[in-house]
């Protein structure tokens, strides 16, 4: 039960942080590229790499690890929004943005996890 509560708290915190960061990015100006979701997902990949490495290394309680990874990172990042925005780019005929977004998100996401692990080791 404690794990569920901590995951819940982490998820809510991650969702609020995602909203605040996304709004902050979109206030910078309009573009055809979904920079807010892109930035959130890449940052979330870096964070999950950091959290997994640090919690393994310093032997943090598994409940805290779940709160940070499944809760915070799960609430912060968003695959469903990424998928929806990708489809909208495709439907709008914005093919360069569509391919850049998909390839960039996947490649930079993987590199972000690697960076997070490297930074934490």
Curated annotation (Swiss-Prot):
Activity control, per UniProt: Na(+) is not transported, but it plays an essential structural role and its presence is essential for fluoride channel function.
Annotated function: Fluoride-specific ion channel. Important for reducing fluoride concentration in the cell, thus reducing its toxicity.
Major place of residence: membrane
Protein keywords: Cell inner membrane, Cell membrane, Ion channel, Ion transport, Membrane, Metal-binding, Sodium, Transmembrane, Transmembrane helix, Transport
Any GO MF annotation of the entry: metal ion binding
Transmembrane portions of the chain: 5-25, 33-53, 66-83, 98-118
Cellular compartment(s): Cell inner membrane
InterPro entries referenced in this protein's UniProt entry, alphabetically: FluC (IPR003691)
Gene Ontology biological-process annotations: cellular detoxification of fluoride
Source organism of the structure: Phocaeicola vulgatus (strain ATCC 8482 / DSM 1447 / JCM 5826 / CCUG 4940 / NBRC 14291 / NCTC 11154) (Bacteroides vulgatus)
Pfam families with a match to the protein in the record: CRCB (PF02537)
Gene name in the database record: fluC
Family: Belongs to the fluoride channel Fluc/FEX (TC 1.A.43) family.
Catalyses which reaction(s): fluoride(in) = fluoride(out)
Name of the protein described by the UniProt record: Fluoride-specific ion channel FluC
Residues reported in the UniProt entry to bind Na(+): 74, 77
Any one cellular-component term (Gene Ontology): plasma membrane
Membrane topology of this protein: Multi-pass membrane protein
